[in-house]
Amino acid sequence: MDTCNVSLQILPSVEDSRLYEVVDKVIEYIESTGVKFEVGPMETTMEGKIDDLLEIVKKSQEICIEEGAGRVISIVKIDYKKGGVTMDEKVGKYR
């Protein structure tokens, strides 16, 4: 399976004072998986095999619930093409 990019914006329904704390738990989990990722101010973009990345999205929902969110809204963007696509080929010239 070709390399793709998945961006995840996760919005757990928790008290404002806990929002960053819960999102940080999700980012820590993403980091622990070993996939290439970049954290942005509005979303985290990951690079890898689509099945692996979608499993990470699923687990990220579960982490929010485990952390006390009554509801989780997520916006997921997928960039997938034959032959694969990397974050570097899209934004490398800006680094």
From Swiss-Prot:
This is UPF0045 protein CPE1503. SUPFAM superfamilies: MTH1187/YkoF-like. Belongs to the UPF0045 family. InterPro entries: MTH1187/YkoF-like (IPR029756), Thiamine_BP (IPR002767), UPF0045_domain (IPR051614). It holds the Pfam family Thiamine_BP. It comes from Clostridium perfringens (strain 13 / Type A). The lineage of its organism: Bacteria, Bacillati, Bacillota, Clostridia, Eubacteriales. GO terms for cellular component: cytosol. It comes from the Bacteria. Disulfide bonds: none annotated.
